[in-house]
Regions:
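Hydrophobic positions on the alpha1 helix immediately C-terminal to the Walker A/P-loop
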Residues: 308, 312
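Glycine-rich phosphate-binding loop used to anchor ATP phosphates in small-molecule kinases
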Residues: 359-418, 468-482
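Conserved lysine of the Walker
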Residues: 305
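Conserved NTP phosphate-binding and transfer environment spanning the P-loop NTPase/kinase superfamily
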Residues: 286, 413-557
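Conserved nucleotide-sensing/catalytic segment adjacent to the nucleotide-binding pocket
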Residues: 324, 333, 337-380
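Auxiliary tRNA-acceptor-end handling modules of aminoacyl-tRNA synthetases
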Residues: 53-72, 95-273, 278, 283-288
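Ubiquitin-like/PB1-type beta-grasp interaction modules and other compact soluble beta-rich domains
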Residues: 2-104, 113-114, 126-127, 229
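Hydrophobic anchor at the beta1->P-loop junction of P-loop NTPases
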Residues: 295-297
């Protein structure tokens, strides 16, 4: 007797019966859905699964295409596996590493015993297209973790063997594509034919893997030159290689061998050295006739701008200057006056969430030598208040303006460029899960924000996750276009950071109920954090950038 299951489809708000053991693809076809770009994965009771996932109980299902962030991740992972297989077939003695996002694509390093040329790129792209045309199925294989570790070790894929060996999981899964095996953090599409659009081009010394635009999947993401960003990533990759820590498996082994404190101390010292170098650059400009009046510090949400500005101020003071940090957040309009986005929700990332006329008037008064009273924004009440702090600047004083819009030319249009020093701060995660699974920098920042919002702003993880897509859209519009204008870029991510955030984030994420849309993201983040060993924060210095989110800072916020 066939057991029938009741399946509710969120895409069309219909319920239908299906045989037990039906795949998600069977269910999609059974509902006769017509998604413009086709499904690539689905949320099953708010957990993302691949389309070959079999259903054995009544479920709520929502099918996802590549316009959805989770769907795009599935598409991208599948494309990566195709790239890995193409390189394996073309260069049996070579390999490829997927390193980090840059220029609206993903930077890859092709490891050969020679430099790569345009003909290599052409061959790889042609081979990838052949693999896609052949519509080869992706096979998901579940096994005991020890078996997977042994298999990857035999294949010389030690990055994956180390990751799985230190993950603490009894069982794991890996994927097979023809004769090629690999491990991916998350689901893949059923077969290579699901990949419709991609490109791969030569980019400096490596390759750039390009993907469709999520809002318009019939077009590739526009290629944006980000030379400074690439330089920062590559510098930190070189530093990680010197330390022998390029992947999470390397990191976990080092911590298990008692080196966590060393990694904390070295990472913190490197950041302090970078901050001191930036302070020296500003001082050098002042000594060479360029009067820097404003240091503008921008960066996306939870990049650590505030603590960076305070630490930079200390370094400037050691150089004989008198910095005064001012947070642009204190110039927010009252919450009820915040502009609305296209969905009718408050757009806190908009430039016009700031009271620009008031800010410009106060800045002019300061630069004219007048005294002002600084405002303070109360995030609890959503109102701007008088702080009681008075400020007048003198010849040796530098204003440190920190906020997401600091690099936007519209913020300080009347200040000559020679009087401004611009700094872009972001958490550019340079460690990877393994050679084919990079860690999104947005995950790093989202975890910071979840912890900070919960501890200091009385927001649940559900609320923070629900707003994150809007935050990201605001960053794309208001922040990222100006990052290459910076005179200096500072990477606020710390090598050990995610292992420290883990113990703070996990209990907050577990509070997200499984019947809400944010649960799928909370579940994904919990699975991600499970790859890291825990590192306690007792060795963190009180001036650490992480203290801005965790507490225990010697700075006042």
């Amino acid at each position: 007797m066939t057991i029938m299951l009741q399946i509710y489809c969120k895409n069309n708000n219909l319920t239908k019966d299906f045989p037990e053991g039906s795949t998600l693809l069977d269910i999609y076809n059974g509902f006769n859905l017509e998604m413009p770009y086709g499904p690539v994965s689905a949320k099953v009771n708010n957990k993302v699964e691949g389309l070959n996932f079999k259903v054995y109980y009544n479920k709520d299902i929502e099918f996802l295409d590549i316009t959805n962030p989770s769907g795009m991740r599935t598409y991208f992972r599948s494309l990566c596996f195709i790239l890995v297989k193409a390189v394996e077939e073309l260069y049996p003695q070579g390999s490829i590493s997927l390193e980090h996002p840059v220029s609206k694509g993903y930077y890859c390093t092709l490891h050969l015993d020679r430099s790569i040329g345009l003909d290599d790129v052409t061959r790889i792209k042609q081979k990838m297209q052949e693999i896609i045309t052949d519509n080869i199925p992706f096979q998901r294989i579940e096994c005991h973790t020890e078996q997977a570790v042994e298999l990857f070790t035999q294949r010389g894929m030690m990055d994956k063997a180390k990751l799985l060996k230190t993950s603490g999981q009894l069982y794991t899964f890996y994927y097979r594509l023809g004769d090629t095996i690999d491990y991916y953090y998350g689901s893949l599409v059923p077969s290579t034919g699901y990949i419709k659009l991609f490109d791969i081009v030569k980019y400096y010394d490596g390759l750039l893997l390009r993907i469709p635009n999520r809002k318009n999947p019939q077009k590739l993401e526009e290629l944006v030159k980000q030379e400074k960003m690439l330089e920062v990533f590559q510098e930190y990759h070189r530093w990680n290689q010197i330390l022998g820590i390029s992947t999470v498996g390397d990191f976990n082994i080092a911590c298990n061998n008692g080196h966590a404190t060393d990694l904390i101390n070295v990472s913190e010292a490197l950041q302090e050295k970078k901050i001191a170098h930036i302070a020296d650059e500003i001082t050098h400009r002042n000594q060479n006739g360029e009067r820097v009046k404003l240091v503008l510090i921008s960066g996306p949400s939870s990049s650590g701008k505030t603590t960076f500005s305070k630490r930079l101020s200390i370094q400037l003071m050691t150089n004989g200057l008198k910095p005064y940090p001012i947070s642009l957040d204190d110039y927010f309009v009252n919450r009820e006056d915040t502009p609305l986005d296209e969905n009718g929700e408050h757009d806190f990332e908009s430039l016009y969430a700031l009271d620009l006329p008031f800010f410009e008037a106060q800045l002019k008064e300061l630069l004219d030598g007048k005294e002002i009273e600084l405002p303070r924004f109360n995030f609890t009440t959503g109102k701007r208040e008088n702080s009681g702090k008075k400020l007048r600047i003198d010849e040796n004083m530098i204003l440190i303006l920190e906020g997401i819009h600091a690099l936007n030319p519209a913020l300080t249009p009347n200040i000559p460029a020679a009087n401004k020093y611009k700094i872009y701060v972001s958490a550019l995660t340079t460690i990877s899960l393994d050679n084919h699974n990079y860690i999104p920098t947005t995950d790093n920042r989202l975890l910071r924000r979840i912890i900070r919002d919960y501890r200091y702003r009385n927001y649940s993880a559900e609320a923070t996750i629900s707003r994150w897509e809007s935050v990201r859209a605001g960053e794309d519009k208001w922040i990222f276009p100006y990052q290459e204008y910076a005179d200096a870029m500072f990477n606020s991510a710390l090598l050990f950071e995610l292992a420290v955030l883990k113990d703070y984030a996990e209990p907050i994420l577990r509070k997200v109920p499984n019947n809400c849309p944010a649960y799928s993201e909370a579940h994904r983040l919990l699975r991600f954090l499970a790859y890291f060993v825990s590192v306690q924060d007792n060795e963190l210095p009180p001036t650490s950038l992480l203290r801005e989110f965790l507490g225990g800072s010697s700075f006042r916020y």
